[in-house]
């Protein structure tokens, strides 16, 4: 979604790093991360919560300063560990139950942009 890509760009404009973290092992995910110029892309990650310390070390950030958007049960553990979590409108009920912010838009249809706008508004 072009709006999601613009969300990444707007975050980069204020020096906020973006990371793709997916359980998929697909060239499509990597290509999308490259296209929107994400700072890093981790693919084929089954235990996303186990990657948190790696991400924190790589970008010199605390978990409490990380915002994360996820849509399914494999996102729940990491959502509980970060400072701000969100779920798209079409996320699972389990993910919605632990998220700090529920997007009005669906994943792939602007949910990331909606979340990035929330993050950007908090920086003003």
Question: What residue spans do the PLM features occupy?
Answer:
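Alpha-helical substrate-recognition element adjacent to the catalytic core
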Residues: 1-47
